[in-house]
Amino acid sequence: GSTLEVPYYVKKAAMHAGKNFGRLSIVLPEQTLTFEVCATTDGAKAVSEEHLELQCGRMRLAQLYIDYRLKKIVTGAWANQSVELLDHMMAMEPECEMYALMKAQALIVNRQKQEASWIMEDYKRGCRDRETPEWGYYLYLCTLIEREPSYVDKLTDEIELLFKKNPKSSLLFWILLFLRESYYYSSPRKYKAIEAWIEGGCSSPYLYLESYYLIWQDPYLLTRLGTYELKVLRWAMRQGVLTKELAQQIRHLLPEVREKSRVLYEILEAAYQVEPEEEMLSAICAYLIRTQCYETEYHRWYELGIEQKIRLTGLYEAYLMSLDAREVGGVPRMIQMYFQYDSTLSYTQKAVLFVNIIAARTKQPEVYQKYQRTMEQFAMAQIEAGHINDHLAVIYDEMLPKGILDEELAHSLAPLLFTHRISCTNRQIARAIIWHEEMKMPQSVSFVNGTAYFKAYTPQYSIVLEDTNGNRFCSSVVYQDEALMYPERYVDQCL
C-alpha cells in the first residue's frame, strides 16, 4: 500500500520540561522525507533548563581559566568575570560548596585575600566531612594565602592522605600538581603523571591545560608524537595557541612517525600556519609520502612543494597520484620533463599525465612533441591490455589517427570501442545492472568513486541501479550514461 509505519523511541532522560521538538528523516536515493516530532514531559525526570545553564556555566568557567593561564586575558578580567559567573551559579545551586571555593580562588589570585578569607571561614565552619576532595581544595586555597614553607608542607601532607582515600579524584590530582615537591623539581615527571590520567580516560580541560603549559614552557618535553601528545596538541590547536617553537619541535619529531593519522595531519596544518617555512613544508610532504597520502585533499601540499622547489624523493609521483582525475590542467614543466626519462607510475597515473600534456599541446608544443612517441607506445600497450577509462579514451582518440592501428591492435581495440561510462553522484549506489535485448544475461558493474564502465554494442539496453542494501531503482535515481569513444571512426578497421 501507500502507508509505512516507522516506530521510534524518545529518551525521556534527555528531555527538558515542557515541549521538546525534533525531526525524523527517511533518506532515499534522490530525496529525504522529514517529519517534525514534538514530545512533552512534566519534567519529573527530565534534564532541566537550569541544569543545562549550570553545565554551560562550568564550561565557561573552565574556558575563562584557560584563557587566563594562556595569557589571553589579564588577571583582573579573569577574576571579575569568574566571580560574576560564580555568584550567578551560587544563586542557582546554593548547596554546591565548590562554587564558593572557586570564587575564593579567583579573589586570592586577584589580591582580594580578605574577601576570600571570609568565604573560606564560612566554608570551614559549615564543613562536616573533611575527607572529601572539596576539603582538599579548601586546604589548597589555604596554601595560596599563607605561603610559609612548613605550613604548605603540612597541608600538602594532609592533601596527600586525602588523595589516598580518593585516588580517582582528578581535583586532588590537579591540586597536587602544584604542591608535590617531586613535580615542582621535575617537569618531565609532572608531564608523565598527567599522561597517565589522560590516557586513563580523564578528559578534564584543566589537566589538558597543565600538560600543554609544560610543553609550552619547554617544547623539548615533547619527545614523541604518540596518542597522548596528539591529544594535547589537538587541544592546543583548538585553543589557537600552537606556538612556532612547538611547531618546530613537531617538525623535528615527524620523521619518526610511520603511520597515517588524521589528528596529526590536522595538527600539521595548524603548525604550518604558525611556521610557513620551507623546512616545515618539506617535513609535511615527506610525512604524507611516507604514509601514502595520495588522495586529492593532499594534492595542495605536493603542488606547494614543487612550487617552492623542494628536493624530495617521490614528490613528483605524489603530485600526479593525488591529482584530481576529474580536472585537466597544466602540469608543471619540471614534472613533464622528469617523467619523460624516469617513470614508476601506474598506467592510470601515466594516463593523467598524458591527458594533461595533450590538453596543453597548443601552449607547450615542444613538450607534446617530446612525448608523442611515448604516448603512442603507451596507447598501443594499454589497448592490447584491454584497459579503458576516461583518460585512456582521450589518449586513444588522440593517438589512433596517427597510424598506430594495425590488424593485431584492431582486434584488441574492437571491444573497447563500445565502452560506456555511467556516473552517479549518489554514493549509496553500488552497482549498475545493464539488460540488453540481444543478451540473455545482464552485465553487472560496480561503481568506484561514482563511476562504472560497461559495454553497449547496440542502443537497445536498459539500466537498473542497485544501492548498498540491495534495493534496485529504474528511474528514480539520476545518472549519466555516456559513450567514451566514437566507434564509427574505427569500426571498419576492426572488422
Per-range role (PLM):
Residues 1-417, 421-462, 467-473, 479-483, ...:
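Feature for long, exposed domains in two main contexts
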